[in-house]
Structures are given as C-alpha cells and as structure tokens.
Curated annotation (Swiss-Prot):
Protein family: Belongs to the UbiA prenyltransferase family. DGGGP synthase subfamily.
Domain of life according to the entry: Archaea
Protein name according to UniProt: Digeranylgeranylglyceryl phosphate synthase
GO CC entries: plasma membrane
InterPro entries found in the cross-reference section: DGGGP_synth (IPR023547), Prenyltransferase_related (IPR050475), UbiA_prenyltransferase (IPR000537), UbiA_sf (IPR044878)
Main location: membrane
Gene transcribed to yield this protein: ubiA-2
Source organism per UniProt: Saccharolobus solfataricus (strain ATCC 35092 / DSM 1617 / JCM 11322 / P2)
Amino acid sequence: MSLKSYMQLVRIHNVIGAALGAIMGFLVSSQWYLELKGILLSALVVGLIAAGGYVINDVYDVEIDKINKPYRPIPSGKISVNKAKALSIALFIIGIALSILLNIYALVIALVTAIGLIYYAKDLKKTGFYGNLLVATTTALSIFYGGLAFFSDNWLLRIIIPTLYAFFLTLIREIVKGIEDYNGDSLNNVKTLATTLGINKSWRIAKILLVLLLIISPLPFFIGFNLIYLILLILVFIPFTILSIIQKETIEGASKARTYLKISAISGIIAFLLGSLPFFKG
C-alpha cells in the first residue's frame, strides 16, 4: 500500500483533467475574472467527486478487473475493497460539503452527480449505452459546474459549446473503452455497445462520432474563441483524434485509441481555456 497505489486508484490524471474542466468553465463563464475562491472551490468539488466516482467504480468492478486489469490497486491486493469504499465515501462527502460554499445550484448538482456516479458503478454500467450516457453527462458537467460557480449573465451561452464537446468526446471514449474491455465484460454479462452490437459495429459508431466531432471542431474559432484555440486544434486535437480513427477495429486498437482520446480531451480543455482569453482574436 503506497501513495502511488492511491493515486492510481483515484486515476489522478483524470481527476486533474476534471478539475481543469471546472477551472475552464469558471474562467470562460467569468471571461477570465480571477476570483480565487470560486476557481479553487469549483475545481476541488469536481476533483473530489470525480475521484470518489473512480474509486467506487473500481470497487464494483473488482471481479471484472481481475480479468481485464489485474494490475489495478484493488484486484492486485494493494488496496482492500473496504478501504476503497471508505475512501470513496469520504471523497463524496468532502466534495458535497465544499459545494455548499458556492451556491445552492452547485450543491444540488454536486449531490445529484455523486448519486449518479454511485448508481452508475453499481447498476447502470451494466445496462450498456445508458451507462455511457451518464458518464458522458457527469464528465461534461465538470465544465458546466465551473460556469455555474460564477453564475453571471450569459454564463450558459459562453460554456455550452465546451460542455457539449466534453459530452461527445467522453461518450466516444466510453464506447471505445467498452471495446477494450470486451473479454471481461462478456464473461461477467456486462452490457456495453461492444457486447450488445459487437466490436465492429461499436467501432463504426465511435468512428462516425469522431468524424462528426472533427468536422465541427473549428466552429468555436468562428464564434469568438481566439487564435490559440485554432493552433492547439490543428497541432494536437485533430492529429490525435485522427490517430484514434485510423486504429484497427480490434480490442488492441481500442486500447491505443483510448490513450489518444485522453490526449485529445486534455488538449481540448487547454484549447478552450486559452482560447477564451480576450486577445489573439482571429
């Protein structure tokens, strides 16, 4: 048992990405008004609840992970199931408690999201596409949550595009993850697009959504985001998204594609964040 094991359990890289999403939502909504309390609180709440969600997901996935990912902290025996449960509960409680310091809307969304993540890990994940939709929704809410923490006039208009991008990119990533986990999911009767429709059809759906995302990706530049957005789009987001699309329609290809999609997601967060700066306009 080590700090490294706990960092792996909470998926610290994904948690940082979620927190950055909240910061981006706040800054875009506030038009880069640097209000430290709102920025830190929104990032902390989102990060803590996301971490709690990842931990509780691993708790319920322990049998599947013994097949798909035996190196993970719980199936490898580095962290016990009981300790993981306690950690998840603590993360959720602290995150919800901190949300009270923002506003009532932030509290409601934090509470609903935490309940949704528990429901997803326990039951909804096994229903397939509906589970994918919930994961995509909660991920996109990290950006929305940051904007809600500022809650100014026209905040919704400013963050709706990055929120939608996060939703669709996460949905695609969940479909690809289902392909990657096909063997373990099949043995444990977990319903995903891959186990329901097959690997090839699931790949096609993911690739169609990725192509559509690529087609509309320049849109934010033409409606107000600055030149930095376009540069990051061309240099990082588009290349790694294309790398995801051209992967072989296999389980191994899905594993590579999911890595590329993580890079696309992080680059997208940075692009929207820097692209909302009030200079370098095209």
